[in-house]
UniProtKB/Swiss-Prot annotation:
Disulphide linkage map: none
Protein name: Uncharacterized protein YvdC
Organism name: Bacillus subtilis (strain 168)
The organism's place on the tree of life at top rank: Bacteria
Matches recorded under InterPro entries: MazG-like_dom, MazG-related_YvdC, YpjD/YvdC
Signal peptide: none
């Protein structure tokens, strides 16, 4: 899936459910929640959870969980960017330019 297609799909999906009605401060809160879930998935994949109250998952299930949580983070970033009239392509271009400039003499 191309980045622009993914953005379009996410925006339509979120709008259909009324999820775009939340303002930027609430959206950032959701982003932080998803970042925490991604951190949990990374931990499970890298060092395990060591929780007797949780079912141990296979490596494939852990990787799928990583992918899904990354998608949740990207989805929230895409919706937040859209609130400010910015595309993910704009975000990535600015990020690339910032890092290139910052480290051009390193």
């Amino acid at each position: 899936m191309q980045l622009a297609d993914a953005e379009k799909w996410m925006k339509e999906f979120y709008e259909k459910r009324g999820w775009t009605e939340y303002g930027p401060f609430i959206r950032v809160g959701f982003l932080m929640e998803e970042a925490g879930e991604l951190a949990r998935a990374v931990r499970a994949y890298e060092i395990g959870r060591d929780r007797p109250d949780e079912k141990e998952s296979s490596r494939a299930e852990q990787k799928q969980e990583l992918i899904e949580e990354m998608g949740d983070v990207i989805g929230n970033i895409a919706i937040l960017a859209d609130m400010y009239g910015v595309s993910l392509e704009d975000v990535m271009k600015a990020h690339q330019e910032k890092l290139t400039k910052r480290f051009e003499h390193a």
